[in-house]
């Protein structure tokens, strides 16, 4: 038992809690990497993008991994903005506004995009039109993606940001030492509160992101039948 445990008998429990919360954070990070790569694959296949996949940096910090996802999403958003600008340029203003209208049927939106997608991409597929509608013509999906970026940036800037991803494999004491070293011996309780606070938002944002991109993929599969 560490000497501090005699003075703070709750420390062993807190160490276990930090360990558990750290794993939950890593699970959310891993999911966000996977979903971002799935989205990248869809964009490369159907919109002709050349986006690279990303991989969790196991020897990096939480901030470094958050930044990897943020950078990948920003590149995705840049490609989607190009498609949006092309649609705005090629479509009649009334038709373009319909793409942004949540009351319009998705099938009608796909039909609108289908009119000009060949001019934009060089070929016309209903799958490409569906991707454009789900990702460019949906303020809901855009909002979900932006929220994830915001949450990741907040985690990276928090006291958790400098914690190494791999410390979990080195044992609970190593996690504790890493945390204490990173924040100049801030109490375990503060670390737990930080994990809990950010996990609530991260889990919510990650789940919504996963759901939104899964919906895009399912729509594309339906269009390809």
Swiss-Prot record:
Tagged with keyword Metal-binding: no
Swiss-Prot/TrEMBL keywords: Coiled coil, Membrane, Transmembrane, Transmembrane helix
Protein name in the entry: Single-pass membrane and coiled-coil domain-containing protein 3
Gene Ontology annotations for the cellular component aspect, listed alphabetically: membrane
Subcellular location: Membrane
Top-rank taxon: Eukaryota
UniProt-listed InterPro entries: DUF4533, SMCO3
Membrane-spanning segments: 155-175
Signal peptide interval: none
Coiled coil: 62-92, 183-207
Topology in the lipid bilayer: Single-pass membrane protein
């Amino acid at each position: 038992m560490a000497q501090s445990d005699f003075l703070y008998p709750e420390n062993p429990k807190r160490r276990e809690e930090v360990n558990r919360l750290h794993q939950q954070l890593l699970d959310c990070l891993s999911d966000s990497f996977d979903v971002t790569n799935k989205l990248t694959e869809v964009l490369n296949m159907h919109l002709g993008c050349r986006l690279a996949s990303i991989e969790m940096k196991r020897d990096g910090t939480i901030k470094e991994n958050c930044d990897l996802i943020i950078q990948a999403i920003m590149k995705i958003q840049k490609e989607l903005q190009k498609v949006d600008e092309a649609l705005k340029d090629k479509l009649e203003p009334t038709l373009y506004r319909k793409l942004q209208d949540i009351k319009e049927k998705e099938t009608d939106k796909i039909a609108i995009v289908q009119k000009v997608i060949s001019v934009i991409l060089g070929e016309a597929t209903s799958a490409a039109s569906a991707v454009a509608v789900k990702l460019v013509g949906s303020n809901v999906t855009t909002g979900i993606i932006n929220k994830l970026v915001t949450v990741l940036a907040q985690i990276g800037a928090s006291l958790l940001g400098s914690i190494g991803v791999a410390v979990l494999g080195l044992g609970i004491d190593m996690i504790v030492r890493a945390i204490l070293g990173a924040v100049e011996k801030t109490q375990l309780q503060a670390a737990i509160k930080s994990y809990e606070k950010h996990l609530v938002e991260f889990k919510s944002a990650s789940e919504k992101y996963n759901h939104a991109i899964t919906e895009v993929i399912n729509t594309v599969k339906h269009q390809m039948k």
